[in-house]
């Protein structure tokens, strides 16, 4: 997906060993459809060469205010006026301090100072040693630069080049890309508190066996990311899946349907939008064996008695907050056939304003899907596309249905 198509990003590099990550970040920005103009400080050029960044960006790299290639000798004006955003990655402690002080004695800081502040946003990806990050001076400067209008993207935690471990690592290139895409996304869910369920549940039979399904959780995780990009505060209740948590999303891991119900009920009181994408098991064994059930040589299968699991969506949809309109509920239906008929019937049975249907066996575990939206007005198809693209479309569809 060319999610940054038409965007012109000025990528600034200040001095730090994390400059090596900027090379991959540059490539990912371009792959997402952006054009990238690289500007480097003298210190950055000690960690990675302008030749490398020029080869990756396909554009001449700027490093000096006194660049004869600019006819008017004003690269700080020319480059900043062309930008849709300026992203400093890595952004050193020194460079943050320079921004706070309004220093303008080299091209990159001068360009940040000269940018039209109401039109060209400034995004900072800090990178430094953990002690430098935690120092009161750095924290003061971060607060001030944010107050001055910059967006601080945060840092990672982990091993650092110095051999220490802690906060201060620059975010990974994929995380930075996710943040940039989120920054430009329309904030159609601003102010909403969104609760999402995703993935399968696992209903244990004995310590080594259980009942589950083929849901991968990919659709729910994609919706969580899209909702966060749309400005929502997102909590994701995830069944047993091995997927990375989207940036900025709070995740609660659960196993069984009962675990999921407890987590959802614990979060629903503060939510304004509930999206139930999880494929919750309909049944569980009445009594879980504490030991592995073994064959007894008779050839007869063990007798298993089943009880129905709680209907999480219906229970939330029937809650006082949902009935009053304070909590908007969206359900999902994974069917094997007769999708429209089953989805329409399920919407009425669950008591939700919007039901999203899909053919489960064809899409479980896949990266693409097609969706059918069913509400009281009728139905609408979202044609086959990546789950990422469908999640963005679905978030927009939900946003326009929310009570104002």
Predicted regions and their residues:
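A cross-family phosphate/adenosyl-ligand binding-site feature
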Residues: 1-124, 129-404
């Amino acid at each position: 997906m060319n999610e940054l198509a038409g965007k012109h990003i000025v990528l600034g590099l200040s001095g730090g060993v994390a400059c090596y990550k900027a090379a991959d970040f540059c490539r990912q920005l371009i792959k997402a459809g952006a054009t990238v103009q690289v500007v480097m400080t003298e210190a950055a050029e000690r960690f990675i060469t302008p030749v490398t960044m020029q080869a990756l960006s396909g554009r001449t790299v700027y490093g000096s205010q006194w660049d004869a290639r600019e006819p008017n000798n004003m690269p700080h004006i020319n480059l900043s006026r062309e930008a849709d955003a300026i992203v400093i990655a890595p952004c050193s402690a020194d460079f943050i301090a320079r921004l706070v002080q309004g220093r303008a004695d080299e091209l990159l800081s001068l360009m940040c100072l000269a940018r039209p502040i109401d039109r060209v946003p400034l995004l900072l990806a800090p990178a430094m040693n953990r002690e430098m990050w935690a120092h009161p001076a750095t924290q003061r400067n971060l607060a001030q630069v944010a107050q001055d209008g910059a967006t601080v993207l945060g840092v990672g935690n982990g091993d650092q080049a110095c051999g220490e471990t802690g906060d201060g690592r620059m975010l990974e290139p994929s995380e930075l890309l996710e943040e940039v895409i989120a920054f430009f996304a329309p904030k159609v869910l601003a102010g909403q508190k969104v609760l999402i369920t995703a993935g399968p549940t696992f209903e244990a039979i004995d310590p080594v066996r259980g009942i589950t399904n083929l849901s991968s959780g990919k659709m729910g995780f994609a919706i969580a990311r899209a909702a966060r990009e749309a400005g929502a505060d997102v909590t994701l209740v995830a069944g047993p899946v091995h997927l990375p948590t989207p940036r900025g999303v709070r995740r609660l891991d659960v196993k069984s349907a009962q675990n999921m119900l407890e987590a959802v009920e614990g979060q629903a009181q503060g939510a304004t939008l509930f999206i139930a994408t999880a494929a919750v098991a309909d049944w569980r064994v009445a009594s879980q064996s504490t030991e592995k059930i073994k064959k007894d040589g008779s050839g007869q299968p063990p007798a298993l008695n089943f009880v129905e699991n709680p209907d999480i969506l219906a229970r939330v949809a029937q809650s006082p907050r949902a009935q009053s309109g304070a909590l908007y509920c969206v359900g999902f239906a994974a069917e094997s056939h007769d999708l429209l008929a089953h989805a329409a019937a399920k919407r009425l049975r669950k008591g939700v304003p919007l039901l999203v249907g899909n053919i489960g066996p064809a899409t479980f575990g896949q990266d693409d899907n097609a969706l059918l939206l069913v509400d009281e007005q009728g139905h609408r198809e979202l044609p086959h596309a990546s789950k990422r693209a469908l999640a963005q479309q679905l978030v927009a569809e939900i946003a326009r249905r929310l009570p104002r």
